Structure formats: structure tokens, C-alpha cells
Design a protein with these regions (language model features):
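Domain-level signal for soluble alpha/beta catalytic cores
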Residues: 1-250
Length: 250
């Protein structure tokens, strides 16, 4: 049967900027998520996220609710990256993956809204390379234009679907869809072009990361540091002193 995802939005507040406290936002999310579960949704879709702290708050509410009820549903987290390549508060895709990877109950990490599929390619490529679980992408139908004072999305269903075909066959994307500007015709064409395809296998690179609000940093140094041990001491190691005196540096 079709799966019903309950949409859980970013609210109008950014906790990283002090617009709302963590506890108040968590309480609001808990109330919404409880209502969604009572209504019978199959999936939590925490989407259009623009602040890592807001995501963590929603995940805290979801995990607390799952523990209280003794059961859980799949969780999708979908972030919004502006044309600059960053979330609204400045986080880039490396910060997102580094900060969210420890939350092992995130089933899908996705990108949605703000831009069209073309602008999302480099971010999808990063997720395909570094995110260890399922990847999703739900772009707009291109970037909006102002036509007679109204937003107009020019991307055709065929163009839109061709990007999704690429996402699946080149980057191994598992979940696809559409956001602003997409119409039934866009999604029908996506189904026509993509429904028979299997996601390409991914070779995910595992690496230890640390992250600020803005970017992620690998903890692996290249080149690696040279470790100098106690035996490389001319006073305490006669063999080492003899090698130095013989200028044997091999």
C-alpha cells in the first residue's frame, strides 16, 4: 500500500540564532509528531531544514517519542541548501553529514527546495560518497523566474525526470521526488523514466569528522604525521647513535 509521510517543517524560528529555545521547539515538535503518529502516518519527513540545531531538536523529539511509545517509524531528514551551497544559517553539506551521521535512526538524508536539480548535483555527489545510509533528493522545477509578477518554473517534466534518472544511475539515490514548481506532469514523467531503474551501488568513504556550524573537517591528516619514538635518541640508544655517526639514514 502507499506509504504516507508526515511532513514536519522547519517552523519560522531558527534556534541557532536564538529565535526560540531548544525546549520550546522540542515541545512543539513532540505535539506535532504525536498527532501524526495517532493519525497513522508511516514515515516522519523532517524537511526543508535550514538550521542544524533545529534538526537536532526535531530528532530529539522523535527519539524521545519513540522511546515513550515503544515503537518507531522511519525518519527522513531533508535539508535545504541555498544557491550559495549553504543552509540559511551557513552550514555546508560537509557540516551536515558530519553532524548527522551519529544519529543512526535517520533512515534517509535528503535535499529539497531552494534550487533545481542542476544546483543540487554537487551536494548529491557528496552524500553519495560520504553518507552511509539512504540518500534522497527532491528539487524544485528549476529556479523560479518572475513572470508578470508571479513565480514561474520553466523546467519541463522531461528535463526534470532526466536529472532524477542521473541521480539514480550515477549516484545511487534511493528516494526521489519534487518540491516547488513541480506539477503532476513532472512526477508522472519521473515515474515513467525512473521506476524500472535500480540505484547504482555506492562505495561510501568512512572517515572521522568534526564539524562547526559552518563546515566539516576530516580528522585524517594527509600526509600523516611522522611519529618520533624514544628509541630515536642518540643519548639513550647506542644503535641509533652509531647509525647517525655513520650517516646511515636509510
Amino acid at each position: 500500500h502507499p506509504l504516507i509521510a508526515g511532513s514536519i517543517g522547519p517552523t519560522s524560528m531558527l534556534p541557532s540564532l536564538g529565535n526560540i529555545s531548544f525546549d520550546d521547539m522540542a515541545a512543539a515538535y513532540t505535539e506535532q509528531m504525536s498527532a501524526l503518529l495517532d493519525a497513522g502516518v508511516d514515515i516522519f519527513q523532517i524537511e526543508t531544514c535550514q538550521d542544524l540545531l533545529q534538526i537536532k531538536c526535531a530528532l530529539y523529539a522523535a527519539e524521545s517519542l519513540f522511546k515513550a511509545r515503544g515503537s518507531r517509524c522511519p525518519v527522513v531528514v531533508s535539508v535545504t541548501l541555498e544557491p550559495s551551497g549553504n543552509m540559511l544559517v551557513g552550514s555546508d553539506i560537509s557540516a551536515i553529514t558530519a553532524a548527522l551521521e551519529p544519529y543512526d535512526f535517520i533512515d534517509v538524508l535528503s535535499i529539497n527546495c531552494a534550487t533545481g536539480p542542476l544546483e543540487m548535483v554537487r551536494h548529491v555527489a557528496h552524500l553519495a560518497e560520504y553518507w552511509p545510509r539512504a540518500v534522497g533528493v527532491m528539487p524544485n522545477a528549476g529556479l523560479p523566474e518572475n513572470v508578470d509578477g508571479k513565480p514561474f518554473y520553466r523546467m519541463t517534466p522531461e528535463e526534470f525526470a532526466s536529472f532524477h534518472k542521473r541521480f539514480v544511475t550515477e549516484y545511487g539515490v534511493n528516494v526521489i521526488g519534487g518540491c516547488c514548481g513541480t506539477r503532476p506532469e513532472h512526477l508522472a514523467e519521473v515515474v515513467r523514466q525512473v521506476s524500472s531503474l535500480k540505484p547504482a551501488p555506492r562505495q561510501v568513504k568512512k572517515q572521522a569528522m568534526a564539524a562547526s556550524l559552518f563546515s566539516g573537517v576530516s580528522l585524517r591528516q594527509n600526509p600523516a604525521p611522522a611519529l618520533i619514538g624514544e628509541r630515536t635518541n642518540a643519548n639513550g640508544a647506542r644503535q641509533f647513535r652509531d647509525l647517525l655517526e655513520a650517516e646511515d639514514f636509510a
